[in-house]
Amino acid sequence: MKRIATTLTALLLMAGTATAQDYGQTRTLKIWDNKTAPHGNGIATPEREPEKNRLTDVSEAVLYIFPAAPEKATGQAVVICPGGGYVKLCIDYEGYEMAQWFAEHGITAAVLKYRMPNGHPEVPLEDVEQA
């Protein structure tokens, strides 16, 4: 029984790692927890994905780092803030795919999954300033 539990744990850890690496990011950083952020957005519901790669109800800011290809690294970096009209984040083609392009061209990219404003316009601005 112990061997089965160990095997299942290892498989779950590998599956989580594979999911985190789907787009090539090598590091994930929480910008801050809701206790240290200057303002909260009042969203109490869990983050949702009503459409594929479209996030809503984001209440935790996270930075996904895509390092430049070492042989092409220029020493430059960019922070990408995906659009969505402050209602959702189009995190794939306006975030991850752009970051991959920059990384392939020697520029380290960081995709910011910023908190939705939910009537508090200062919240996403604080996230990008902190990033």
What are the roles of these predicted feature ranges?
Residues 85-87, 109:
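Serine-hydrolase catalytic-loop signature spanning alpha/beta hydrolases and amidase-signature enzymes
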Residues 89-92, 97, 112-131:
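Catalytic nucleophile-loop/oxyanion-hole region of alpha/beta-hydrolase
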Residues 74-83:
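Short beta-strand element of the alpha/beta-hydrolase
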Residues 21-72:
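N-terminal cap/lid segment of alpha/beta-hydrolase-fold proteins
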Residues 77, 103-110:
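A fold-wide structural signal in alpha/beta-hydrolase
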Residues 11-18:
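Hydrophobic h-region of N-terminal signal peptides that target proteins for export
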Residues 2-10:
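Sec-dependent signal peptide recognition
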